[in-house]
Amino acid sequence: MGSKMASATRVVQVVKPHAPLIKFPNRRDKPKLSASEALGSAALPSHSSAISQHSKGSTSPDLLMHQGPPDTAEIIKSLPQKYRRKPMSQEEMEFIQRGGPE
């Protein structure tokens, strides 16, 4: 008899609908490139030319740091400062390139 009473007072729980916390950019409206077009558009300037352009000041540092799809660059610029990547000095880059201390 106790089990009948327990089942009569059982509470029905409602599950909340899932709301995703991560927002991804909508890329469905962008046309897909063929393999040859994708390789041609993905060609980036060499590391040495990017450094020489940076030293001349002809290209903004934001453009050099974020050479991705334009929507990604806009998202990175809108991030609060505490979530952005710390700029790397020329000395740090050289240290990494040579593989550590000499």
Swiss-Prot record:
Instruction: Spell out which residues are annotated as carrying N6-succinyllysine.
Output: 4
Residues with the Phosphoserine modification: 48, 60, 89
Q: Name one Pfam family in it.
A: Kgd4-YMR31
Where N-acetylglycine occurs, residue numbers? 2
Any one GO biological process? 2-oxoglutarate metabolic process
| GO terms for cellular component | mitochondrion; oxoglutarate dehydrogenase complex
Top-level taxon of origin? Eukaryota
Q: Where is the composition biased (Low complexity)?
A: 33-46
Task: Assign the protein's first listed, main location to one coarse class.
Answer: mitochondrion
Tell me the segments the record calls region Disordered: 23-70
- Where would you find this protein in the cell? Mitochondrion
Q: Which family does it belong to?
A: Belongs to the alpha-ketoglutarate dehydrogenase component 4 family.
The record's function comment reads: Molecular adapter that is necessary to form a stable 2-oxoglutarate dehydrogenase enzyme complex (OGDHC). Enables the specific recruitment of E3 subunit to E2 subunit in the 2-oxoglutarate dehydrogenase complex (OGDHC).
Q: What is this protein called?
A: Alpha-ketoglutarate dehydrogenase component 4
Q: Which gene carries the instructions for this protein? A: Kgd4
